Regions:
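Bacterial N-terminal signal peptides
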Residues: 1-10
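Short, basic/low-complexity N-terminal boundary segments at the transition from targeting/disordered tails
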Residues: 3, 62-74, 131-143
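A short structural micro-motif
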Residues: 7, 144-149
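A contiguous strand-loop segment
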Residues: 15-116, 152-154
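Alpha/propeptide regions of enzymes that mature by internal proteolysis
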Residues: 23, 114-146
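Noncatalytic scaffold domains of N-terminal-nucleophile
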Residues: 98, 133, 158-159
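Surface-exposed patches in mature extracellular/periplasmic domains of secreted proteins
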Residues: 139, 150-158
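Extended amphipathic alpha-helical segments with heptad-repeat/coiled-coil character used for oligomerization
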Residues: 155-174
């Protein structure tokens, strides 16, 4: 019987992430997540972005996309590059995370004529958390940018939550 269980429930690589949110009986609210990435090391590191820091987005042709200044301080967990925050929170209590979205999403085609408002998919969390304090601000802000994928990156989508428990998921179907 144990052999059958091992064959049926065998070990396999996982690339799924799970996001949860909980509200306690006292009304306090928390968001959490897992990161399961079987394709190799993500070179994860904690990052701190102070309010006022000047930032710029990558595009498929280099670091020549949207320029922005942090309105809010941010702490987060970056993967691969310091700019690619997978999960973070800002000083206003807004939290955001990116989640793998294979086979379901797609991005706008890259057009260098729009670099001044082009944002790399893996920098959306960094940008949202440095610019927005509420879900309503996030919804308005995403209408003003063009999100593009970087070469060799997976399509992702984003989960954003504020301290009141409001949440939104932004899919990458543009």
């Amino acid at each position: 019987m144990l052999g059958v269980a091992a064959m049926v429930g065998g070990v396999h690589a996982s690339v799924a992430c799970t996001g949860i949110s909980l509200t306690a009986t006292d009304g306090s609210y928390i968001q959490a997540r897992t990161i399961e990435w079987a394709y190799g090391p993500l070179k994860s590191e904690y990052v701190i972005i102070p309010r006022g820091q000047e930032l710029q987005s990558y595009t498929p042709t280099g670091m020549n996309g949207l320029r922005f200044k942090a309105r809010y301080g941010v702490v987060g967990l970056a993967v691969v590059e310091r700019e690619f925050i997978a999960e973070g929170i800002n000083e206003a209590g807004l939290s955001a995370g990116l989640f793998f979205f294979p086979r379901y999403g797609s991005y706008e085609g890259y057009d260098s004529a729009h670099n001044d408002h082009t944002l790399a998919d893996l920098q959306v969390v960094q940008w949202m958390l440095t610019q927005c304090a509420t879900i309503d601000e996030v919804k308005a802000a995403v209408e003003r940018v063009r999100i593009v994928g970087l070469e060799k990156t997976a399509v992702v989508h984003w989960r954003i939550g504020d301290p009141t428990g409001r949440q939104v998921v932004i899919d990458s179907r543009w």
